[in-house]
Amino acid sequence: MLEGYYKEKEKRREQGLPALPLNAEQVQAIADLFESGEGSDELLILLENEVPPGVDEAAYVKAAFLKDLALEKISTDLIPPQKAIAMLGTMLGGYSVEALVSVLKTNKFGAEVALALKHTILVYDSFNDIFDLQDENEYAKEIINSWANADWFTNKPKVETEIELTIYKVGGETNTDDFSPAKEAWSRPDIPCLL
C-alpha cells in the first residue's frame, strides 16, 4: 500500500500537483496495520495528515478507527486514547463528531473531548446530544458554554490589517464553476490544473 501511495505521490509531484489524500481502502489498510501491531510513525503521519476531514469515505474509516481507540476497544502504543481524541478533533466535524460524543457519554477523557469539540462547529444534530448531556456531564456543559461564547471564533488569530489578493473580473453572468473543475475535480487542490 505504501509503495503504491508514494509512487503516485511522486508522479503527481513531477506534474506540480500535491498528493491525493488517502482513500478509504488505504486508511483501512493503515488501521489494520496498527491493530495487528505493525503501526509506525510513518503510518501515523499519513493517518494524521493525509486523510480528508469531514464526510469523505476515508474520513469515515479514520473516525471509526480512532473512536475504537478512544473508547479503548482496541489499543496501539503510538495512538493512546487521548491522542485518538485529539486527532478526531482535527477532522473539522463530520464523522468525528459522533465518535467524540460517544466518548463524551462515557465520562472518561472528558477534558480531552471538550477541548476537541470546543473548536468544532460543524456538529449539526449532535448539538442536541451534547446539550442534553450538560445537566449530568460537566464537560458537555463546558462545550455548550464555549460555543455560546464563540471561543472557536474569538481564539483565532487576528486578521491581518492588509491582505494582498488577486481579483478576476469576468464579464457577464458567472459562478465559481468558471474557476473550478467542480464535479470533475477529485479534490480542491486540483484547481491549479484548470487555471
Residue ranges and their predicted role:
Residues 24-32, 53-72, 91-105, 122-134:
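Amphipathic alpha-helical scaffolding segments comprising HEAT/armadillo-like alpha-solenoid repeats
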Residues 34, 38-43, 192-195:
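Active-site-flanking structural segment that lines cofactor/substrate pockets
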Residues 6, 27, 81-82, 97:
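Residue-level signal for cytosolic alpha-helical hairpin/rod architecture
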Residues 31, 35, 47-51, 184:
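Short amphipathic alpha-helical segments enriched in leucine
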Residues 17-20, 41-57, 71, 78-93, ...:
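Structural detector for internal amphipathic alpha-helices that build alpha-solenoid repeat scaffolds
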Residues 2-31:
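Amphipathic alpha-helical packing elements
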Residues 113-195:
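Fe-S-dependent hydro-lyases/dehydratases of central metabolism
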